[in-house]
Design a protein with these regions (language model features):
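Active-site-proximal beta-alpha core segment in soluble small-molecule metabolic enzymes
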Residues: 1-117, 124, 140-143
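C-terminal active-site-proximal or functional interface alpha/beta core segments in diverse enzymes
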Residues: 84-190
Length: 190
């Protein structure tokens, strides 16, 4: 299933116009700029001042546009991205709480949300120190997964909103432990 994610408000009318042209009801996602910022080397790629994503106000405006077209059920995914290699689990927890509250409010306003994309950020403990420095993380994969589920579930339960299907973009954590060294053979012996 392909879900186009709106990262700039000007993309929404393009998606809606094209969907109308080809006669489909699109499944749409929106990337929210959270107030929470990531940590570590790539922290500027997330947060409210990020060049990617929509403010909460823009998302609400987008939902109103969808409602005007009778398409609020088409908004099915909320996405956020803190950055890459988030070293401190507290940052992740804060962002999860904020994003979950946006998810709940959009659901209450009539969005057909089913998915929460928690983006990237799952870090790798490169130096083995288990600290919140750039080359490490102060959490395990299991702790990260538990926190994602717990925080989304708790906020949704408090608001009596169905739990979302969780999507993650944890590319670094998937590939970091697998590497390959490629080089030219300079000579052969024997």
């Amino acid at each position: 299933k392909v879900i186009p994610v709106v990262e700039k408000y000007t993309e929404l009318p393009l998606i809606l116009d094209y969907a109308e042209k080809v006669g489909v009801r699109p499944t749409i996602g929106m990337r929210v700029k959270l107030a929470a910022r990531g940590g570590g080397r790539w922290q500027s790629s997330g947060g409210y001042r990020s060049k990617f994503g929509l403010t909460v106000g823009e998302i609400l405006k987008g939902l109103e546009e969808l409602k005007a077209r009778g398409m609020e059920d088409c908004l099915q995914l909320l996405h956020f991205h803190l950055g890459s290699q988030i070293p401190n689990i507290r940052i992740v927890k804060g962002a999860l709480n904020e994003a979950a509250r946006v998810y709940v409010e959009l659901s209450r306003l009539g969005a057909g949300l089913k998915y929460m994309d928690v983006g990237g950020g799952l870090g790798v403990d490169y130096d083995g120190s288990q600290t919140n420095f750039e080359s490490s993380v102060n959490y395990t994969l299991q702790e990260y997964a538990n926190d994602v589920v717990y925080h989304l579930q708790t906020v949704c339960d408090e608001a009596n909103v169905p739990h979302p299907t969780i999507i993650s973009e944890s590319g670094r954590a998937v590939v970091a432990h697998h590497s390959l060294l490629v080089f030219n053979v300079l000579g052969v012996s024997g």
